[in-house]
Amino acid sequence: MSLRSDLINALYDENQKYDVCGIISAEGKIYPLGSDTKVLSTIFELFSRPIINKIAEKHGYIVEEPKQQNHYPDFTLYKPSEPNKKIAIDIKTTYTNKENEKIKFTLGGYTSFIRNNTKNIVYPFDQYIAHWIIGYVYTRVATRKSSLKTYNINELNEIPKPYKGVKVFLQDKWVIAGDLAGSGNTTNIGSIHAHYKDFVEGKGIFDSEDEFLDYWRNYERTSQLRNDKYNNISEYRNWIYRGRK
């Protein structure tokens, strides 16, 4: 099986219960996770690390993580004999308040490495041949007062967890990318806004990775500039048809 197939199977493995109760101290105290999305995103990245390392080693890949904060990607995989065929893996997390809601992710900046080959990226962008997203989706559970206390190892079953119903997928970034910025005035690429199965099946809006890259390399930062150029995929294709005018 391929690296990708093995990784997908490992992520879907029913033995991966994604059942973290909290953070344990050297004294044996367990601190419940709480509902902070940044904390939970870190937890799911920790889930992914040993899976990625195990499958990568099986296929002869080296795994590197960024030495600088906010550098892309979370994991770089490559074979020493093929340094210009690197694979980027980024871990993304989102939540729903009830099951089967539509979901959306932010997929990284559009003004950094896709425009400047070496900006905020572990290796030059043109050394990567694939960009994969491992996406985690969970349903939020209302925080209870019991999450404010600490526990010991004998009280594991009493510790409230702020999430349930974890789902995971692996997909190419360009396949699940949308045509709108991630949120507000940020310069992040937004994903499609769709159901979980649409991410699994890759029901995106771009015809190719080249179209995705060209769209986001030319996407303007402000709405005023976009109004003179394009705001969405339909307007982009018209812009192309007009000779980029």
From Swiss-Prot:
Changing P73 to A/G: Loss of activity. Mg(2+) 2 binds at E45, D74. Its cofactor is Mg(2+). Mg(2+) 1 binds at D74, D90. The active site is at D74, D90, K92. Binds 2 magnesium ions per subunit. Keywords: DNA-binding, Endonuclease, Hydrolase, Magnesium, Metal-binding, Nuclease, Plasmid, Restriction system. Changing N70Q: Decrease in activity. Changing T186 to S/N: Loss of activity. GO terms for molecular function: DNA binding; metal ion binding; type II site-specific deoxyribonuclease activity. This is Type II restriction enzyme EcoRV.
